[in-house]
Amino acid sequence: MRKFLAPVLFVFTAAALLTGCKKNAESSLTPVTLNEVAHSIFYAPQYAAIELGYFEEEGIDLTLVNGAGADKVMTALVSGDADIGFMGSEASIYTYIQGDDDYAVNFAQLTQRAGNFLVGRTPEADFKWENLIGKKVLGGRAGGMPQMVFEYILKKNGIDPTKDLSIDQSISFGLTAAAFTSNDSDYTVEFEPFATALEQEGNGYVVASLGKDSGYVPYTAYSAKKSYIEKHPEIIRKFTNAIQKGLDYVNTHSAEEIAETISPQFKETDTEKIAIIVDRYKEQDTWKENTVFEKESFELLENILEEAGELDTRGPYEYLVNTEFAKAAAEK
């Protein structure tokens, strides 16, 4: 009887120890809530970091929330419902100028190109922006990066956004593609996967990349309240390390490999379509090599805000951007 019980007790004890170790390992992870502006393949490095376990490697138990808009992400950040916000950096400038003492500080930049595309009714191999003169376009929310970058491109090409064409800004973010299939607009400005979906359904054709035609723009970045960064620098450091690993991955792997990795984040989209979208973003040099938010990029962003009539007073780069964690992550 003893001979039988000994191995059984050993197995039971070993299992208990392993379970205990697992629980201890899990409890050692620091919970962090990240509120993102949208859930899009445009942010592939972030999802690669999630799916490949880079946050866990850094000791972070990440909860991801889709804020559906930069204004909502900033609200969550300011209220404390989110630890870290991921959005266009214009939101942090607005908050600072409004006089908030505990303002949002950008500590890591992810994308360096606009992620939206101009979709028309017919193919236009030799598209020129002047083709939009006299046309109706489904645009974005006033003051948001998609709309401001669109207007910035129009002005660069000598087109007045308020006089030379009609821009419909009445449709909510994420619903313009559906509206485009049933209304009389000539063009729509779309993120992925909506641009590719319109093409595959035969309801539209990508005629221009706003990312290519606007140039390098600090489109989306990670930010946290000044007090949070001061209180939890180690969390910010580890979070930035995980994002850097995600960037390293997408910059060294094929579109097909990336699509396979991030596919659990986009269950409604088949892997082949994800690969097409990733390839489109890779081709326009969407993702940075590192997360350092350079001063020149910040100043370009404020130029765009000023030209859009959304900024009367500039926010100081030295207050609104912290590159300490990004530089350290890039050197690892």
What do these predicted ranges mean?
Residues 230-312:
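Secondary-structure end/capping motifs
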Residues 91, 173-266:
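Pocket-lining segment of extracytoplasmic ligand-binding domains
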Residues 27-162, 166-170, 186-192, 203, ...:
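Short, glycine-/small- and polar/acidic-enriched structural segments
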Residues 1-4:
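Positively charged n-region of N-terminal signal peptides that target proteins for export
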Residues 43, 74, 78, 89-92, ...:
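Extracytoplasmic/secreted envelope proteins and their assembly/folding machinery
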Residues 17-20:
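C-terminal motif of bacterial Sec signal peptides marking the signal peptidase cleavage site
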Residues 57, 130, 212-214, 284-293:
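Short, solvent-exposed loop/beta-turn-alpha elements that line the ligand-binding surface or hinge
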Residues 301-332:
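Conserved C-terminal helix/tail region of periplasmic/extracytoplasmic solute-binding proteins
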